[in-house]
Amino acid sequence: MVKVGVNGFGRIGRLVTRAAFNSGKVDIVAINDPFIDLNYMVYMFQYDSTHGKFHGTVKAENGKLVINGKSISIFQERDPANIKWGDAGAEYVVESTGVFTTMEKAGAHLKGGAKRVIISAPSADAPMFVMGVNHEKYDNSLKIVSNASCTTNCLAPLAKVIHDHFGIVEGLMTTVHAITATQKTVDGPSGKMWRDGRGAAQNIIPASTGAAKAVGKVIPELNGKLTGMAFRVPTPNVSVVDLTCRLEKAAKYDDIKKVVKQASEGPLKGILGYTEDQVVSCDFNSDTHSSTFDAGAGIALNDHFVKLISWYDNEFGYSNRVVDLMVYMASKE
């Protein structure tokens, strides 16, 4: 089982750790966060406003974080190059601070003894992998990879299925996205993106997202054919993708439902879900899929122009894919 270090114990860092313990697929051996001391880590891991209390034991003991009886080394370094991952036995590092997202910055982890780095965010220059879409293109010469964004992980599996069966000529995506930590609780300053600084709980906020364009990186045939935007809405978690696209081959909406359902039960099982139930966002809280197609919500204008809807837990679904990507990478060592 691959031994993993987590850098940044925020939403994704904590939930990757939860996903690791829930699945038993990877072994968390170290955590680094300069802003959270050990006792605070115990509290933050144990209690979660969105996903509920951790079902297990958490305590601090001899300067280590102990989860379900497993001791985890704790570091509090600001500079990734100074974290002694090697001493803790961490082979892979999940870079989940949201700060060190380039090859150069994330590469600092290799200096401390890590063998590979998985960036839990889109990256300007690191190769991006989406489980179920292009993960098989990974080869073990790559030391630093990106797990793309939660939205790309939702959109790409759906886009792949649709493109493989009917061909996507072009498309626009909108994600109606839950609040994240980059937003403000009340109006505040926000650099160049003025709207992003408006109160998150009070507003529907139009925002930019690179998620749709990033699909072109993981599915090269769709490069230049998709773009999109986001609306940030006042919900704590769970988001939904609306993909409106023109199809090459004529397809009835029932044909689309059929191929997505087949994919969800076959090659994309566990990654792409399918539902015909009358669901709403809360129904996907703590869901582990990257994307769940909502058969009842989509519409077709005609046989070539459709709007497709897919839900995702932008925190927990994504965190589970980070774990899955590491398991896949470890299988190629």
UniProtKB/Swiss-Prot annotation:
Chain positions recorded as D-glyceraldehyde 3-phosphate binding sites: S149, C150, T151, T180, T209, G210, R232
Residue(s) carrying N6,N6-dimethyllysine: K3, K64, K192, K213, K225, K258, K261, K332
Membrane-spanning residues: none
Localisation per UniProt entry: Cytoplasm, Cytosol; Cytoplasm, Cytoskeleton; Nucleus
One GO CC term, this protein: microtubule cytoskeleton
PTM annotation (ADP-ribosylcysteine): residues: C150
Phosphothreonine: residues bearing it: T151, T175, T180, T182, T209, T227, T235
Active site: C150
Entry comment on modification after translation: ISGylated. S-nitrosylation of Cys-150 leads to interaction with SIAH1, followed by translocation to the nucleus S-nitrosylation of Cys-245 is induced by interferon-gamma and LDL(ox) implicating the iNOS-S100A8/9 transnitrosylase complex and seems to prevent interaction with phosphorylated RPL13A and to interfere with GAIT complex activity.
Documented EC number(s): 1.2.1.12, 2.6.99.-
Modified residues (Deamidated asparagine): N7, N62, N68, N147, N153, N223, N314
UniProt pathway: Carbohydrate degradation; glycolysis; pyruvate from D-glyceraldehyde 3-phosphate: step 1/5
Residue list for modification Phosphoserine: S120, S146, S149, S239, S310, S331
Phosphotyrosine, modified sites: Y40
Modification S-nitrosocysteine occurs at: C150, C245
Annotated stretches, region: Interaction with WARS1: 1-146
Entry-annotated residues carrying Cysteine persulfide: C150
Primary localization: cytoplasm
Motif interval(s): [IL]-x-C-x-x-[DE] motif: 243-248
Cross-link Glycyl lysine isopeptide (Lys-Gly) (interchain with G-Cter in SUMO2) residue location(s): K184
Residues that hold NAD(+) according to the record: R11, I12, D33, R78, S120, N314
InterPro entries: GlycerAld/Erythrose_P_DH, GlycerAld_3-P_DH_AS, GlycerAld_3-P_DH_cat, GlycerAld_3-P_DH_NAD(P)-bd, Glyceraldehyde-3-P_DH_1, NAD(P)-bd_dom_sf
Keyword Ubl conjugation: yes
Job of this protein: Has both glyceraldehyde-3-phosphate dehydrogenase and nitrosylase activities, thereby playing a role in glycolysis and nuclear functions, respectively. Glyceraldehyde-3-phosphate dehydrogenase is a key enzyme in glycolysis that catalyzes the first step of the pathway by converting D-glyceraldehyde 3-phosphate (G3P) into 3-phospho-D-glyceroyl phosphate. Modulates the organization and assembly of the cytoskeleton. Facilitates the CHP1-dependent microtubule and membrane associations through its ability to stimulate the binding of CHP1 to microtubules.
Subunit structure: Homotetramer. Interacts with TPPP; the interaction is direct. Interacts (when S-nitrosylated) with SIAH1; leading to nuclear translocation. Interacts with RILPL1/GOSPEL, leading to prevent the interaction between GAPDH and SIAH1 and prevent nuclear translocation. Interacts with CHP1; the interaction increases the binding of CHP1 with microtubules. Associates with microtubules. Interacts with EIF1AD, USP25, PRKCI and WARS1. Interacts with phosphorylated RPL13A; inhibited by oxidatively-modified low-densitity lipoprotein (LDL(ox)). Component of the GAIT complex.
UniProt protein name: Glyceraldehyde-3-phosphate dehydrogenase
Species name: Canis lupus familiaris
Lineage summary: Eukaryota, Metazoa, Chordata, Craniata, Vertebrata
